[in-house]
Amino acid sequence: MSTRHISAPDGVELALHRLRAFRDRRPGVLLVHGAFTNHRFWLHATDGAGGNGGLAHFLGAAGFDVWLADLRHHGDSAREPRPLAWTFEDWVLRDAPTLVTRIREETDGAPLAWLGHSAGGAAGLCWLARSAAAAPPPPPPPPPLAAVVTLGTPGPRSLGPLRRTLAASTIAMSRALGRFPARALRIGNEDEAAGIIGEWMEWNVRGGWVGTDGFDYFAGLAGVKTPYLGVAGGADRFFAPPAACRQVVARVGAERKALAIEPGLSHRGLVLDERGRSSCWPNVVVWLKETL
């Protein structure tokens, strides 16, 4: 695996990894992690005997040019210089276009899919929504992505009292500590920047993806025409239940879109559970090959 370090528009250094280099313009897949983790999330499945690699290697074996992102404050990318310096919208407005532009430059514009888990999926969709809203009058420019797949990405559903309390507690704890202590709580291998997780949680508490300038990202999904596959874990009862993932699929304006519910898989299990090899991962591969 090779790594290149690139600069976002605000000067933040991002790490972008490539599983293997190709020169034949084969379709590519950019894997984008969510909160509390990094690009290594895609490299290993935790519930099997080991040795077979994770979803990244599975996609590579299927013939795709696989790229792995480290969003700001994660993995090999730059860390937040001070608490609350960055927000979730920095992932959307700065990191997403920087990563995609670099890949398209290196691959001579080969077809590229964004495959994101949880908030990493939302970041890609929100970027496309913003791009669609800012597009010039017809004819529109070619879309930057040929497909989007999200694993466990929920819409801004109405939270019950317990979930609302937990989300509000997450925001308060993050602001008090300057970070969310995911490692100490054993829910991830990286602590999350307070501003990033805070904005994402606030969107869910408020029931809408509304940016700091008032732009309604969720409403803007209607302008996203890129083919879209949403995947939900049938055993995910808390983070991204199927009903919440269905909200996103229903809102996206693409003619080609679908929701797949994978029985028995949890939120993180969509990527980390070895059982994903038997259904979830092959289904994603089939959809990508039909689309790219």
What do the predicted segments below correspond to?
Residues 258-292:
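Catalytic active-site module of serine/aspartate enzymes centered on a nucleophile-bearing elbow/loop
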Residues 237-243:
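Conserved alpha/beta-hydrolase "acid-adjacent" motif
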Residues 1-21:
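N-terminal cap/lid segment of alpha/beta-hydrolase-fold proteins
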Residues 85-105:
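Alpha/beta-hydrolase active-site loop
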Residues 224, 230-232:
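Short beta-strand/loop motif that positions the catalytic acidic residue
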Residues 22-71, 75-76:
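Short, surface-exposed "cap/lid" segments of acyl-processing enzymes
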Residues 70-74, 154, 265:
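Short beta-to-alpha linker loops that shape the active-site pocket of alpha/beta-hydrolase fold enzymes
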